[in-house]
């Protein structure tokens, strides 16, 4: 459910982006609805609405949601201010690499890697498995960031489709692979430090 809520602004961005640009007037202001810039405005507005509603309901946002919202406001705002989609193309790579940095930093800060802090309440695994899983997430975020950057600046007509559905597809595949891997270790003795091959 949480993943679906996080996906709403991106889906609205995609829908508006795919519309043929058409002139509109609201309260005496003329603008073009459809295309990259109105889609960016929709992304900003819908992100504020979605995360604002979550904050009012839960009295908090997760760190990843704060990062996503701030990146949306910064890169989306720069895109609209300078009328250049280049800024928006950097959003997904930067967010993914910041996530990778956060997961990597947890190996040196605190007594548990980040993935264990996130999932440790639901799963009991040896520390070696948590470490390996955390490294997998670091690699995943680095790859997603690089893939988004490559597609955004190489395939101009395809990058929005990839941003929405390519990233989602990679995430689903990774989560399935993680589930298969974890299923092999769910009954491991947590005191054991050596993972299965």
UniProtKB/Swiss-Prot annotation:
Pfam families in UniProt: IspA
Predominant subcellular localization, coarse grouping: membrane
Compartments it resides in: Cell inner membrane
Domain of life per record: Bacteria
Membrane topology of the entry: Multi-pass membrane protein
NCBIfam families attached to this UniProt entry: ispZ, PRK00259.1-3, PRK00259.1-5
Signal peptide coordinates: none
Transmembrane segment boundaries: 36-56, 64-84, 90-110, 135-155, 162-182
Role, per record: Plays a role in cell envelope biogenesis, maintenance of cell envelope integrity and membrane homeostasis.
The name this protein goes by in its record: Inner membrane-spanning protein YciB
UniProt family annotation: Belongs to the YciB family.
GO cellular component: plasma membrane
Entry keywords, A to Z: Cell inner membrane, Cell membrane, Membrane, Transmembrane, Transmembrane helix
InterPro entries, sorted: YciB
Organism: Pseudomonas putida (strain ATCC 47054 / DSM 6125 / CFBP 8728 / NCIMB 11950 / KT2440)
């Amino acid at each position: 459910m949480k993943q679906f809520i996080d996906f709403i602004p991106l889906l609205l961005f995609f829908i508006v982006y795919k519309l043929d640009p058409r002139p509109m007037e609201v309260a005496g202001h003329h603008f073009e609805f459809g295309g990259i810039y109105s889609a960016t405005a929709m992304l900003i507005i819908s992100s504020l609405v979605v995360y604002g509603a979550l904050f009012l309901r839960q009295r908090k946002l997760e760190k990843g949601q704060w990062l996503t919202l701030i990146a949306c406001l910064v890169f989306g705002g720069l895109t609209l201010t300078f009328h250049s989609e280049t800024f928006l193309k950097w959003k997904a790579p930067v967010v993914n690499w910041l996530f990778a940095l956060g997961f990597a930093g947890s190996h040196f800060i605190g007594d548990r890697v980040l993935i264990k802090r996130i999932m440790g309440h639901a799963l009991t695994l040896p520390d070696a498995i948590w470490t390996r899983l955390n490294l997998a997430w670091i690699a995943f975020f680095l790859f997603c960031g690089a893939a988004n950057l490559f597609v955004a600046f190489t395939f101009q007509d395809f990058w929005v489709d990839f941003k929405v559905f390519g990233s989602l597809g990679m995430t689903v595949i990774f989560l399935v692979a993680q589930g298969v891997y974890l299923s092999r270790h769910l009954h491991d003795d947590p005191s054991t430090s050596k993972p299965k091959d």
